């Protein structure tokens, strides 16, 4: 794990995180994801912001693909592993990230169109990617911060 000092952005500190700790965090996240899904709790994602501030290296690695994978896979095991959370794609600070909602969807779709499996075959079908994007768009339209 590499952490950057906000006051000295060019300096970083490396911290060893044990595999057992990582496995524990993964199990807690999976349990929370299933709880969120069962209660209909929505999760907002900000792909460009998440790429900059997290450990993912590309849009194709974004956690949204693990949180909700209906229509992009028919692998029963992968479908069962995913909590199928009510997710949405959003933008973070437009002044900092210079993006739009349309751009965030396009970045995810373009990244997914390039992903290949172990044999070098395209992992996702373009039509399925756009169905997945549309499902997420609809979930985003239903999410609200209202108490009603």
Regions found by a protein language model. Give the residues of each.
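Short, small-residue-biased leader/transition segments that mark boundaries at the very start
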Residues: 1-3
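Second-shell residues forming the walls of enzyme active-site clefts
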Residues: 16-42, 50-75
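Amphipathic alpha-helical protein-protein interaction segments
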Residues: 22-25, 53, 94, 98, ...
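Mid-to-C-terminal alpha-helical segments outside catalytic/metal-binding sites
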Residues: 30-39, 103, 107-148
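Secondary-structure transition/capping motifs at alpha-helix termini
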Residues: 39, 70-81, 114-119
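Short acidic/histidine-rich active-site segments
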Residues: 45-48, 83-100
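Short beta-alpha connecting loops at secondary-structure transitions
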Residues: 51, 88-91, 120-125
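Histidine/acidic-residue-rich catalytic or RNA/ligand-binding cores of hydrolases
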Residues: 53-64, 97-110
């Amino acid at each position: 794990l590499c952490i950057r000092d906000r006051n000295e952005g060019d300096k970083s500190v490396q911290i060893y995180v044990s595999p057992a700790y990582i496995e524990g965090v993964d199990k807690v996240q999976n349990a929370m994801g299933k709880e969120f899904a069962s209660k209909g709790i929505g999760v907002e994602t900000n792909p460009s912001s998440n790429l900059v501030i997290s450990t993912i290296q590309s849009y194709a690695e974004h956690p949204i693909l693990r949180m909700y994978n209906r229509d992009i896979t028919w692998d029963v095991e992968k479908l069962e592993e995913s909590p199928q959370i009510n997710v949405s794609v959003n933008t973070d600070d437009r002044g900092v990230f210079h993006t739009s909602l349309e751009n965030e969807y396009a970045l995810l779709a373009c990244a997914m169109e390039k992903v290949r499996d172990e044999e070098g075959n395209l992992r996702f079908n373009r039509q399925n990617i756009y169905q997945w994007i549309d499902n997420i768009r609809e979930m985003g339209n239903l999410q609200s911060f209202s108490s009603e």
